[in-house]
């Protein structure tokens, strides 16, 4: 099974769940590689990361871009050393709030040459449980602020105070290569540390690799890495730290959305999936 993205139009990225050969346009040119879901694409190391496709998603949403820096690339054994996230307001001219923290890790850090975070800073950083709690508060604060901005009268204020978490605007969490790495690494770490991941059950997830496939990467030498997209869209990128990558990814996606006269959330809606966290977490526990 594959999620095929036929390209971007003013109606959004045209995607469908199907199987078969690669998708080509009317001239036979390759438009997009299939984004594979389930056991063939979304995986924890060598295990499947179970996903549930979203058939229809048109409600209010709040978009965040996430990035992790880690001790290595093996989600089954490496650990998070930095967690960052940036809110993407509906107005692309607005900056949006940002969250960033270094995280204490005990695994051997083989990726210092990538992120450049000193061992002393990692050793003195908050543990993952503390960082995760702060991250959840950051997301919830943005949700409440968004609700507050949409309510005016005193009666609406009372209604806002009685809202259940399930009634908040949907959190849409985007990451580049997120299905294979960032989301998988995050869930692995939460399960390993015996922490709750129930909030993630209410969120939707977008892997922006699918966007790269939809818009085509032939002009970038076939490279779909974030660094290639950044260079291809003339976006400045600082040192490879998590928050810098979040900012760069937001700029790339906003640039694509603007070029098609669309809002960023509308651009990404067709790519949103739910992660079957219970099934995936059960697989983590068997490794």
Walk through the language-model features, giving the residues of each.
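Short linear loop/turn motifs
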Residues: 126, 204, 240-249
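Short, surface-exposed basic-aromatic patches at helix termini and helix-loop junctions that form
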Residues: 191-193
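Short alpha-helix plus adjacent loop in nuclease-associated cores
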Residues: 205-221
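Buried hydrophobic packing segments
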Residues: 182, 186, 211, 249-253
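N-terminal accessory regions of nucleic-acid-interacting proteins
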Residues: 1-64
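Conserved non-catalytic scaffold segment of RNase H-like nuclease domains
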Residues: 47-188, 198-199, 223-234, 240
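Acidic two-metal-ion nuclease catalytic site recognized across multiple nuclease folds
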Residues: 38, 48-57, 230-232, 243, ...
């Amino acid at each position: 099974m594959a999620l095929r993205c036929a390209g971007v139009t003013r109606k959004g990225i045209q995607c469908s769940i199907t199987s078969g050969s690669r998708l080509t346009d009317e001239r036979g040119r390759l438009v997009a590689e299939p984004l594979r879901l389930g056991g063939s694409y979304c995986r924890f190391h060598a295990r499947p990361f179970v996903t549930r496709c979203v058939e229809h998603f048109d409600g209010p949403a709040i978009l965040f871009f996430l990035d992790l820096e880690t001790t290595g690339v093996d989600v089954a054994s490496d650990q998070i050393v930095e967690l960052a996230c940036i809110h993407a307001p509906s107005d692309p001219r607005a900056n949006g709030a940002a969250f960033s923290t270094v995280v204490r890790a005990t695994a051997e850090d083989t990726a210092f040459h990538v992120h450049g975070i000193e061992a002393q800073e990692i050793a003195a950083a908050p543990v993952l449980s503390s960082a995760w709690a702060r991250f959840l508060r950051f997301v919830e604060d943005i949700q409440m602020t968004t609700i507050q901005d949409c309510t005016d009268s005193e009666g609406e204020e009372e209604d806002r105070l009685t809202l259940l978490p399930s009634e908040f605007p949907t959190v849409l969490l985007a990451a580049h290569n997120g299905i294979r790495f960032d989301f998988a690494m995050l869930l692995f770490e939460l399960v390993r540390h015996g922490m709750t991941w129930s909030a993630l059950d209410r969120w939707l997830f977008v892997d922006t690799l699918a966007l790269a496939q939809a818009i085509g990467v032939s002009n970038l030498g076939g490279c779909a890495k974030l660094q290639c997209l950044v260079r291809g869209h003339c976006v400045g990128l600082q040192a490879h730290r998590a928050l810098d990558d979040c900012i760069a990814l937001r700029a790339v996606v906003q640039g694509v959305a603007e070029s098609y006269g669309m809002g960023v959330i509308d651009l990404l809606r067709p790519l949103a999936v739910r992660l079957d966290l219970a099934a995936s977490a059960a697989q983590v526990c068997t490794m």
